[in-house]
């Protein structure tokens, strides 16, 4: 499927409101995406952007007490969008997911947001009902492009969106990634008109677009003003089925950021809140390789392999999110600007 849900037990749900006539400053154009892992999934996070909007990320520090993650929320609406986590918690409580207490459960729902408030009406932003509805819609089929948290996303001057990708390692471990691309930087090489690292997404059969289409990109500025919007953010979720510690997940999240640097230029700017979560379901136990020095963690070799695959998959997911995007509020898509890049 080439999806994050290729990792057994992972489910993804979207919910959005999108008015057909949404514009910059009016109408609904926002949404949320929820990743539901199986019980017992451990997690970690690494934030490299200068303007993050997050929830419960301190809890994911490997030094802290709670190990398991019940859901991850990716939301539009900037900090207001964090309200959608209340709906995720309500859904999880109804399904008895969370840290067991004497009188009930406390769901663990870390999350991160993108800044998309100028796309659509400023007051049209996710509520708790968005989070609840995304959980209720979760399944193994993952829609991409202009959906969920990606509805109001943009990538430089172009429309951004949600993408996903996966890979299977020789060890049998499956790595899957979900990304929402809402970057301040550009995803297209202005010299060629092709996305950076376009060779990673052979399924699109991209070819060099004609010179006039490349020239048109140079004349295009973001409808919101290039680098004049307050904040942006690309969020990634890495999932794998390996049995790993929270500290190992943190190292994988760190490595996965390379996927953003390969496909977004610049990435990790003061205008972005670039954040990557990493989840490990624990379904596949991989014995440590022989010969690992006793001074090193027995997870070292596996973490290296999973981290490398995570970076590759995150790069592919970024490209998939942009290439599958549909126009919203007059923000052009890659397909709008470069029809000549696609085979007939």
Curated annotation (Swiss-Prot):
Keyword terms of this UniProt record: Aminopeptidase, Cell membrane, Hydrolase, Membrane, Protease, Transmembrane, Transmembrane helix
Membrane topology, from the record: Multi-pass membrane protein
Location relative to the cell: Cell membrane
Cellular component annotations (GO), alphabetically ordered: plasma membrane
InterPro entries noted in UniProt: ArgJ-like_dom_sf, Peptidase_S58_DmpA
Enzyme class: hydrolase
Disulfide bonds, paired cysteine numbers: none
Membrane-crossing residue ranges in chain numbering: 25-45, 68-88, 104-124, 133-153, 161-181, 224-244, 276-296, 302-322
GO biological process terms, semicolon-separated: proteolysis
GO molecular function, one term: aminopeptidase activity
Pfam family, one: Peptidase_S58
EC number(s) stated in the UniProt entry for this protein: 3.4.11.-
SUPFAM superfamilies: DmpA/ArgJ-like
Primary localization: membrane
Sections of the chain in a coiled coil: none
Similarity-based family: Belongs to the peptidase S58 family.
Function: Aminopeptidase.
Protein name: Uncharacterized aminopeptidase MT1375
Species of origin: Mycobacterium tuberculosis (strain CDC 1551 / Oshkosh)
């Amino acid at each position: 499927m080439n999806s994050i849900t290729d990792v057994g037990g992972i489910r993804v749900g979207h919910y959005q409101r999108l008015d057909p006539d949404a514009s910059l400053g009016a109408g609904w154009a926002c949404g949320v995406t929820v990743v539901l892992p199986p019980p017992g999934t451990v997690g970690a996070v690494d934030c490299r952007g200068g303007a993050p909007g997050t929830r419960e990320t301190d809890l994911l520090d490997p030094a802290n007490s709670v190990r398991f993650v019940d859901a991850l929320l990716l939301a539009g609406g900037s900090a207001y969008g964090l309200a959608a986590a209340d709906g995720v918690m309500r859904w999880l409580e109804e399904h008895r997911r969370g840290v067991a207490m004497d009188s009930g459960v406390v769901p663990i729902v870390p999350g991160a947001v993108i800044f998309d408030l100028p796309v659509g009406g400023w007051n049209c932003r996710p509520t708790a009902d968005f989070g609840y509805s995304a959980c209720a819609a979760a399944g193994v089929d993952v829609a991409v492009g202009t959906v969920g948290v990606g509805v109001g996303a943009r990538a430089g001057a172009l429309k951004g969106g949600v993408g996903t990708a996966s890979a299977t390692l020789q060890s049998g471990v499956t790595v899957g990634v979900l990304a929402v691309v809402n970057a301040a930087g550009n995803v297209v090489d202005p010299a060629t008109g092709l996305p950076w690292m376009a060779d990673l997404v052979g399924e699109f059969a991209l070819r060099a677009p004609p010179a006039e289409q490349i020239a048109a990109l140079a004349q295009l500025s973001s409808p919101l003003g290039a680098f004049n919007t307050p904040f942006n953010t690309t969020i990634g979720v890495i999932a794998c089925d390996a049995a790993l510690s929270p500290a190992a997940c943190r190292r994988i999240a760190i490595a996965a950021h390379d996927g953003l640097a390969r496909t977004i230029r610049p990435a990790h700017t003061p205008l972005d809140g670039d954040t990557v979560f990493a989840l490990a379901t624990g379904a596949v136990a991989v014995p440590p390789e022989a010969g690992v020095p006793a001074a090193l963690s027995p997870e070292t070799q596996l973490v290296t392999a999973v981290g490398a695959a995570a970076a590759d998959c995150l790069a592919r997911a970024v490209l998939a999110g942009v290439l599958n995007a549909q126009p919203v509020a007059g923000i052009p898509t890659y397909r709008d600007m470069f029809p000549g890049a696609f085979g007939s």
